[in-house]
Amino acid sequence: WIMGHMVNAIYQIDEFVNLGANSIETDVSFDDNANPEYTYHGIPCDCGRSCLKWENYNDFLKGLRSATTPGSSKYQSKLILVVFDLKTGSLYDNQASEAGKKLAKNLLKHYWNNGNNGGRAYIVLSIPDLNHYPLIKGFTDTLKQEGHPELLEKVGYDFSGNDAVGDVAKAYKKAGVSGHVWQSDGITNCLLRGLTRVKEAVANRDSGNGYINKVYYWTVDKRATTRDALDAGVDGVMTNYPDVIADVMNEAAYKNKVRLATYEDSPWVTFKK
């Protein structure tokens, strides 16, 4: 999965997919009542990027729906996965469950079209704080209450705080999650970060009894870092330059080893070599 980083304006969906991304990451900010409000990152953000692009969250969902609904004039068949980077740092811990409920209602209405031929992309809810694990239950309970438990088949989870792998496992246990787990590791492109924790996450994924299904590394903009990440066995790389990742994947060392994921590749099934 080549994951386009910080895709917060609707026009950027096409821009990143056309550069080679089959997945995008979108920031979601919340208002004081835990309603998802804008797709907005704000300052500071990655070096070389504008941090201030935004849409109203519901408008973005509608744009995303057209980009991922077969038959729509805006349809991009390659776009198969969307990571919502949930900026829950602005919320009190006791609002996490409420944020999950509201997120579920927004997605159900504006993205899934109330279960009636909505967008088809898989969704990863990425949460920065382990204490906000109740967001997951708020989300899953709401989809069930609204009569659409089948949509949970399209939803996965990520804790993005670079916490110890064991602590992340405990948070999932509390949230009642087993499966559909992506594990992120990384840092802004302005700084360097080694691959120690990525390798630990990959080992957990491949152990047969770990909690992780997929591992992605962020933010990867350089060819050398891309090669290191692919060598470490990641499933996804998040990048500001999808074309750079695509180029590296076409190099002799990689072109027979890795390929771009398609809609038929489940993002929840651990790849067995």
UniProtKB/Swiss-Prot annotation:
What does the UniProt entry say about where the protein is found? Secreted
Cofactor binding description: Binds 1 Mg(2+) ion per subunit.
Function according to Swiss-Prot or TrEMBL: Dermonecrotic toxins cleave the phosphodiester linkage between the phosphate and headgroup of certain phospholipids (sphingolipid and lysolipid substrates), forming an alcohol (often choline) and a cyclic phosphate. This toxin acts on sphingomyelin (SM). It may also act on ceramide phosphoethanolamine (CPE), lysophosphatidylcholine (LPC) and lysophosphatidylethanolamine (LPE), but not on lysophosphatidylserine (LPS), and lysophosphatidylglycerol (LPG). It acts by transphosphatidylation, releasing exclusively cyclic phosphate products as second products.
Q: Where on this chain does Mg(2+) bind?
A: E25, D27, D85
What family is reported?
Belongs to the arthropod phospholipase D family. Class II subfamily.
Listed EC numbers: 4.6.1.-
Q: Name one GO biological process term.
A: lipid catabolic process
Q: Keywords for this entry?
A: Cytolysis, Dermonecrotic toxin, Disulfide bond, Hemolysis, Lipid degradation, Lipid metabolism, Lyase, Magnesium, Metal-binding, Secreted, Toxin, Zymogen
A Gene Ontology molecular function term of the record: phosphoric diester hydrolase activity
Q: Which Gene3D superfamilies match?
A: Phosphatidylinositol (PI) phosphodiesterase
Where does the sequence pass through the membrane? Answer: none
On tissue specificity, the annotation reads:
Expressed by the venom gland.
**SUPFAM superfamilies membership:** PLC-like phosphodiesterases
List the protein's name: Dermonecrotic toxin LhSicTox-alphaIA2av
What superkingdom heads the lineage? Eukaryota
Record lineage: Eukaryota, Metazoa, Ecdysozoa, Arthropoda, Chelicerata
> Which reactions are catalysed by this chain?
an N-(acyl)-sphingosylphosphocholine = an N-(acyl)-sphingosyl-1,3-cyclic phosphate + choline; an N-(acyl)-sphingosylphosphoethanolamine = an N-(acyl)-sphingosyl-1,3-cyclic phosphate + ethanolamine; a 1-acyl-sn-glycero-3-phosphocholine = a 1-acyl-sn-glycero-2,3-cyclic phosphate + choline; a 1-acyl-sn-glycero-3-phosphoethanolamine = a 1-acyl-sn-glycero-2,3-cyclic phosphate + ethanolamine
Active site, per annotation: H5, H41 (nucleophile)
- InterPro entries per record: PLC-like_Pdiesterase_TIM-brl
> What is the disulfide pattern of this chain?
C45-C51, C47-C190
